[in-house]
Amino acid sequence: MDEFHRYGKEDSSWQQCFLYPLFFQEDLYAISHDHYLDGSSSSEPMEHLSSNDQFSFLTVKRLIGQIRQQNHSIVLFVNCDPNPLVDRKKSSYSESVLEGLTLVLEVPFSIRSKYSVEGMNEWKSFRSIHSIFPFLEDKFPHSNYVSDTRIPYSIHPEILVRTFRRWIGDAPSLHPLRSILYEYRNSSESLQRSIIVVPKVNTRFFLFLWNNYVYECESILVSLLKRSSHSRSLSHGSFPQRTHFHRKIKNIFLFSRRNSLQSIWSLKDPNIHYVRYGERSIIAIKGTHLLVKKYRYYLPIFRQCYFHLWNEPYRVCSHQLSKNCSSSLGYFMRVRMKPLLVKTKMLDELFIADLITDEFDPIVPIVPIIGLLSREKFCDISGRPISKLSWTSLTDDDILDRFDRIWRNLFHYYSGSFGRDGLYRIKYILSLSCAKTLACKHKSTIRVVRKELGPELFKKSFSKERELDSPPFSSKAAARSQRERIWHSDIPQINPLAHSWQKIQDLKIENLFDQ
């Protein structure tokens, strides 16, 4: 594979490299078999391989031969096959074939992604999860419209094959991919036989297909957004009484009236910013309502025409930040005006100026969090704490640890907000629910539990607040923490409540369009 990388670096015609012979290399399947063993041992036990079973490369080659001899006309119109290649029980041989196919296809993909993003400049880091936080802090306050789009998981197999065909010149290497995709589609339990649903599982094959599909969408979309957001540079121009504008000459475009020779100068800022996290993509736009409306209709049409993919209207939601709050990452996102008092001293005179700046202000959604806690039986719909009956069979330490973990995750997750006072209400609900759960377990009252356990009741639980009161966190540090936000890069994975709340928000939007 290193030879393919060197070949792609030296020769620009790396698309014509032949990948099909790699499917018959035994070393390739040895690597894929090791990947399968490592993944199985780390996640779940292997049920289909015993200690006496030996991996046979001849069986793998027979499976590849079966792929070559398949009748594609039967695969297209028959729902099931008596000898499926994609085993739903996840056998070692079918997984090795998928791993080997993934390793082969990753060779040109890695070369293409490496040399295609070099010319994208500031757009090259929009795929990283770490880019979402600079986007919110730097780009979000300077935008007046935000569009949130859900990237669908339902993809037709032929769309995936044609996506690979655009940058792989070796057509025979795509026949195994087409056969496996159609057979997986036919063996699926979904009633929609015309599409393939890429599952959200940690399978290297499906993750590679999903990442390649999203990369193809973004590589075209971002280039169009970049082209539309940057104007043509001009070499000269006259500005009477505005000589300080000569530094902004590159952000100026010129257009002429049809019936007049007078030229009109206008400023144009780079006003479109894009970022993606998970299955959601955010586009922040600074412009008029007409411009936002055009982009809202352009994005679904772009996906329909280029990828033959239908986007429902509720998948593209645009919000005006001055009037509404957008929901993302489990926060209510808004922009508020922040007054600043600037004092300037020149010689013996003191000048005071009042400035107003836009500041990004994420809000903790207290009411939705209480609604989710009520669904998990920690409180009722009004926020009144109740006992967690399903945890009464656990030990006292386990109960305290579980409540402690919930509160720690919530406080850690919403540390990116200034106003965390509403979290104390959540703390009250969890602490009282913990006390009621212990009282229900010991068949007593909350007063008796507090009297018996005393300060030991919450010694292990809800320790995050005590960490802020500890000596390393002085009063000045605590006051500074109220004025500063701390974004943690692991928040998209640690809080299932945020994902559940996002699903509820999506369902509400879908119901509005169904009415």
UniProtKB/Swiss-Prot annotation:
One GO term describing the cellular component: chloroplast
Family assignment from sequence similarity: Belongs to the intron maturase 2 family. MatK subfamily.
Keywords of the record: Chloroplast, mRNA processing, Plastid, RNA-binding, tRNA processing
Principal location listed in the UniProt entry: plastid
General function of this protein: Usually encoded in the trnK tRNA gene intron. Probably assists in splicing its own and other chloroplast group II introns.
Record flagged with keyword Ubl conjugation: no
Keyword Plastid assigned: yes
Residues spanning the membrane: none
Gene Ontology BP term (one): mRNA processing
Subcellular location: Plastid, Chloroplast
Signal peptide: none
GO molecular function: RNA binding
UniProt protein name: Maturase K
